[in-house]
A protein has these predicted regions:
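N-terminal glycine-rich phosphate/pyrophosphate-binding loop and immediately adjacent elements
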Residues: 1-104, 108, 113-117, 121
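Conserved redox-cofactor binding core of oxidoreductases
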Residues: 64, 91, 103-169
Length: 169
């Protein structure tokens, strides 16, 4: 498997669970826990420089320049063991069924040759593997079977903020 970002790691995990012997090849070094910006006093500066999502700004040893000047999409890339999951924010959205039919619904680009429902079982499998949490039946999300875990609690800080928002009514 070339690359141990989200896709490569999931594929390697699935293959190894089925008994396959798997080798992963990565472009970059291991990042040690104490190297992450959260352990630095200058976290804000670090996040804008050596931890920037853009390799053109970051310029780490294993980065290579990208040209996204003609694209509205700016990829989040990181060359290391774990790939772009080093920037992972635990947000795992699914495409909506309508995202697969942009030509039909919005007359732009092309429709996908598959539908959301063709991928749903793979989304479910990934959610189970990643132990995704959330609210079942949330209308802001596309249809899905039951989530593997209940929503994460707000915690003390979240409860204070929620209480303050409630007082604004």
């Amino acid at each position: 498997v070339i690359g141990t970002g989200a896709s490569g790691a999931a594929f390697a995990w699935k293959m190894s669970k089925s008994g396959a012997r798997v080798v992963c090849i990565e472009q970059g070094d291991y990042v040690k826990n104490n190297q992450y910006p959260k352990y630095k006093k200058n976290i804000e500066i670090s996040a804008l420089k050596e931890w920037n999502w853009n390799p053109n700004v970051r310029k780490n040893k294993f980065d290579y320049p990208i040209d996204n000047s003609n694209s509205p999409i700016h990829p989040l890339m990181y060359n290391s063991v774990g790939g772009s999951t080093l920037h992972y924010t635990a947000h795992t959205p699914r495409f909506h069924p309508s995202d697969f039919k942009v030509k039909t619904l919005d007359n732009i680009s092309s429709d996908w040759p598959i539908s959301y429902y063709d991928l749903e079982k793979f989304y479910d499998e990934n959610d189970e593997m990643m132990k995704c949490s959330g609210i079942n039946g949330d209308p802001a999300n596309p249809p899905r079977s039951k989530r593997p875990l209940k929503p994460v609690s707000l915690g003390k800080d979240g409860e204070i903020i929620a209480s303050a928002f409630d007082k604004l009514n």
